[in-house]
């Protein structure tokens, strides 16, 4: 093992990962796995292509245990029995009537206790008890300390228990009482801190307790073909949207709430047919939601809850006109008549000023800072010239013991080239970027999550929001130009209180990020290599624009601008309610893509409708 490899050792207690091979492909092939542009990966010396067509057996799709979403072997809604019938709850005479329990469905949704692909989000959350929290605004409700009824609905508590969530995260401790009191919320929390549960738990709990909004008068055929969701969740990428939908299915189990997901890159016809069966909670990317609104397939008149996840990225990267059209120009109830929740890792001043138009009498919640990840993520910065990166990468992978490794590059071309290189070196690798079709992206993510491909090469499309359990090593093969994007990337490991390693290849081409990188390492009490200090002195002396690598002072990115001279329209008074003192910092970003929202792609995938069967939700 070379000196470079010895610089990065995996955390103690991690075992070498065993490769599970699904039964239907154990005796496969003799040909080499698919090359990177087709989304495949090498399987230990050419045991066969993983993404081959297995016909009616369903393949290794997103149904997971025995088939795809519509395969004849089962999955979510397979021919051996869907999730329909008495397992759906109902709202009858002002009361919520839960559906019947079903062990098979619970295994599909929540997994077996020993199944690593259904990682409990309660693992190591004791590490988060000391994270500082600051809540500002008028009459901030008292935080909860455990999952109880009240304030949460009893059915939701049962589903939370099935998901093996043992205690709320800091953001959930505040978001639950805030939403239950009918308040709007702007939540700024570190990545991996349970933001998805932070809005799903209170929104679903209140929906279970209060039921759907009263629908408009039936106008005939068009009414039957239009969805009237009670809650709308918008996310910037299709990957994040499908991930939220995957979680929503768990917590909507046995309830009257039927979740749906819509996003670009998949056939819109399948998504519309799925909504025809009911849509109470709609998870959507802004582009596809606008399309459905223009087609008259969705009405927002019944929306009680609007959630903007990764809100800073959606607004900052160009989605503001689409979001404003959805919120202000369509039939959504106005501000004050709905609850609006905005969740992200940072809210810089300019984003907060844009967001104020969507919020009313809101509470600003800031949870943690960059330094709070110091116990979970070990950051290593290596000086590597561009010509030496491949060699250094092989050294790191040789020391990784087949653990899940996520490698970030800056360009789509490099993602494919590097994946092909790793396959030629007999590594099981696959790639995800914006030029891949939706089917290829979903297959790549499925392979990586399952461990069949233990290396995923990604561009910024996978940098935000994705929650992939058991990623133990993140490698920044190419450092981003914005320090906040670096923070989001390394946040793919060390999630849910678990430990991980983040390695970055640095050279003189990265001087634009050196100041922010130095500050992050210093705040997190990480080792700062001497070459980084030298580069910082050079950059500071030459004034070569290091300040452009961050959006002003990083500490302001998690602070409520109303408390620091902001001219917001919601009043100037604020009250603090905190565990310890908030320390600023946090996770965020202002650059990077959000994926390709073009038409085309594959039928099926996460949440896509299957024409043979109907799903329980």
Curated annotation (Swiss-Prot):
Residues 376-536 form the Helicase C-terminal domain. A motif (Q motif) lies at residues 145-173. A motif (DEAD box) lies at residues 309-312. GO terms for cellular component: cytoplasm. The keyword ATP-binding applies. Keywords: ATP-binding, Cytoplasm, Helicase, Hydrolase, Initiation factor, Nucleotide-binding, Protein biosynthesis, RNA-binding. It is found in: Cytoplasm. It catalyses: ATP + H2O = ADP + phosphate + H(+). InterPro entries: DEAD/DEAH_box_helicase_dom (IPR011545), Helicase_ATP-bd (IPR014001), Helicase_C-like (IPR001650), P-loop_NTPase (IPR027417), RNA-helicase_DEAD-box_CS (IPR000629), RNA_helicase_DEAD_Q_motif (IPR014014). Residues 1-53, 543-617 are annotated as: Disordered. GO terms for molecular function: ATP binding; ATP hydrolysis activity; RNA binding; RNA helicase activity; translation initiation factor activity. Residues 176-365 form the Helicase ATP-binding domain. ATP binds at residues 189-196. Residues 543-558 have a biased composition (Low complexity). Its main location: cytoplasm. Belongs to the DEAD box helicase family. DDX3/DED1 subfamily. ATP-binding RNA helicase involved in translation initiation. Remodels RNA in response to ADP and ATP concentrations by facilitating disruption, but also formation of RNA duplexes. PANTHER family: ATP-DEPENDENT RNA HELICASE DBP3. The Q motif is unique to and characteristic of the DEAD box family of RNA helicases and controls ATP binding and hydrolysis. This is ATP-dependent RNA helicase DED1. It comes from Candida glabrata (strain ATCC 2001 / BCRC 20586 / JCM 3761 / NBRC 0622 / NRRL Y-65 / CBS 138) (Yeast). The lineage of its organism: Eukaryota, Fungi, Dikarya, Ascomycota, Saccharomycotina. The gene is DED1.
């Amino acid at each position: 093992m070379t000196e470079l490899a010895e610089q990065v050792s995996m955390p103690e207690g991690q075992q070498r990962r065993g490769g599970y091979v699904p039964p239907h492909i154990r005796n496969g092939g003799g040909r080499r796995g698919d090359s990177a542009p087709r989304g495949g990966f090498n399987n230990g010396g050419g045991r066969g292509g993983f993404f081959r067509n297995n016909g009616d057996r369903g393949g290794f799709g997103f149904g997971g245990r025995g088939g795809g979403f519509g395969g004849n072997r089962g999955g979510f809604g397979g021919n051996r029995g869907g999730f329909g019938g008495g397992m759906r709850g109902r709202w009858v005479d002002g009361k919520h009537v839960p559906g019947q329990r079903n062990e098979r469905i619970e295994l599909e949704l929540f997994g077996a206790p020993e199944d690593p692909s259904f990682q409990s989000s309660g693992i190591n959350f004791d590490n988060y008890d000391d994270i500082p929290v600051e809540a500002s605004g008028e009459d901030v409700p008292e935080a909860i300390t455990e999952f109880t009824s009240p304030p949460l609905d009893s059915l939701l508590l049962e589903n939370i228990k099935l998901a093996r969530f043992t205690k709320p995260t800091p953001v959930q401790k505040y978001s639950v009482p805030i939403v239950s009191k009918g308040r709007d919320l702007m939540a700024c929390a570190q990545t991996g801190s349970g933001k998805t549960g932070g809005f799903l738990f209170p929104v679903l709990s209140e929906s279970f307790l209060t039921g759907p909004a009263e629908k408009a008068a039936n106008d005939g055929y068009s009414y039957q073909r239009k969805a009237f969701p009670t809650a709308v969740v918008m996310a910037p990428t299709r990957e994040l949207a499908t991930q939220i939908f995957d979680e929503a299915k768990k917590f909507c189990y046995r309830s009257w709430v039927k979740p749906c997901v819509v996003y670009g890159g998949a056939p819109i016809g399948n998504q519309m047919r799925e909504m025809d069966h009911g849509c109470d909670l709609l998870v959507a990317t802004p582009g596809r939601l606008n399309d459905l609104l223009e087609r008259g397939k969705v009405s927002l008149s019944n929306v009680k809850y609007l959630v903007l996840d990764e809100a800073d990225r959606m607004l900052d990267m160009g989605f503001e006109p689409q979001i404003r059209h959805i919120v202000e120009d369509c039939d959504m109830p106005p501000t004050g008549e709905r609850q609006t929740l905005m969740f992200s890792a940072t809210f810089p001043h300019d984003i907060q000023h844009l967001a104020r138009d969507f919020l009313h009498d809101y509470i600003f919640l800031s949870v943690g800072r960059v330094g709070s990840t110091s116990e979970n993520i070990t950051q290593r910065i290596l000086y590597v010239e561009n010509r030496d990166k491949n060699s250094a990468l092989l050294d790191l992978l040789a020391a990784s013991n087949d653990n899940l490794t996520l490698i970030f590059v800056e360009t789509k071309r490099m993602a494919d080239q590097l994946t092909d290189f790793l396959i030629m070196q007999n590594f099981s690798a696959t790639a995800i970027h914006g030029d891949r079709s939706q089917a290829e992206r979903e297959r790549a993510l499925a392979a990586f999550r399952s461990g069949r491909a233990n290396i995923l090469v990604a561009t910024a499309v996978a940098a935000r929001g994705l929650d992939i359990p058991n990623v133990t090593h993140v490698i920044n093969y190419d450092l981003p130009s914005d320090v906040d994007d670096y923070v989001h990337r390394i946040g793919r490991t060390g999630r849910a209180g678990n430990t991980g390693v983040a390695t970055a290849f640095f050279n003189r081409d990265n001087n634009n990020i050196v100041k922010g990188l130095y500050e992050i390492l210093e705040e997190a009490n990480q080792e700062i290599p001497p070459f980084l200090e030298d580069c910082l002195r050079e950059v500071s002396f030459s004034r070569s624009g290091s300040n452009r690598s961050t959006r002003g002072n990083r500490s302001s990115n998690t602070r409520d601008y109303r408390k620091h001279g902001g001219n917001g329209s919601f009043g100037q008074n604020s009250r603090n309610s905190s565990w310890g003192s908030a320390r600023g910092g946090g996770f965020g970003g202002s650059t990077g893509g959000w994926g390709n929202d073009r038409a085309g792609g594959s039928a099926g995938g996460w949440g896509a409708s299957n024409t043979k069967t109907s799903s329980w939700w």
